[in-house]
Amino acid sequence: MNHKIKSYILLMRLNSPIGSMLLLYPCLWGLISASSSFEEIRQNIFLFIIFILGAFIMRSAGCVINDIFDRNIDIQVDRTKSRPLADKSISLYESIAIFITLSSIGLCILLSLNTLSIKVGLLSFILLIIYPLTKRITYWPQLFLALTFNIGVLIGYAAITNILPFEIYFLYAVGIFWTLGYDTIYAYQDIDDDISIG
């Protein structure tokens, strides 16, 4: 495989789809919660396809912007020093171009939804950009990741109902605690490097 193509795949984490699945699950929770029957799910199958595509595209965009912000830190961490931006197999300008391309595709997908979903989706994009920066100002970046990764619950629910009742925020909260759990475990593997970097 061409080395550059392999670097693009690694940058977008296409070799590791589990992150996309973790982003997709909350979207599916929202879509299913908003559906009153299997028949309604079948009728809205196009929305499910849209959310599957959106989850994979925006997870990749999130990984790219994360690596852009963390490129100088990733060099110092054993687990991340071989990432394409850290080892300079991809330039910063290439990475920015990939991020803009992925974000543009994500926006096109988002614009196929209703107005409320678009508004929440734009909020999620802001969170996606803010998350990497929170690692510099708080000991709880997992909370911001959880807010970002689970907002699909709200987008999915709104995509079908065009409303966001108070009750759906309980499901959002469940997702937040779920992500806090698994991401804290994931982050723990870097604890020695985090301490040495400060």
Predicted regions and their residues:
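Short, Lys/Arg-rich, polar N-terminal cytosolic tail immediately upstream
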Residues: M1-L11
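Intramembrane alpha-helical segments
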Residues: I9-L10, R83-F170
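The first (N-terminal) embedded transmembrane alpha-helix
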Residues: L14-S33, A146-N150
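Hydrophobic membrane-targeting signal helices
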Residues: L24, L28, V64, I109, ...
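Functional transmembrane core segments of multi-pass inner-membrane proteins
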Residues: I32-I50, I118-S124, L128, L143-I195
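Solvent-exposed interhelical
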Residues: G54-L107, I176-G198
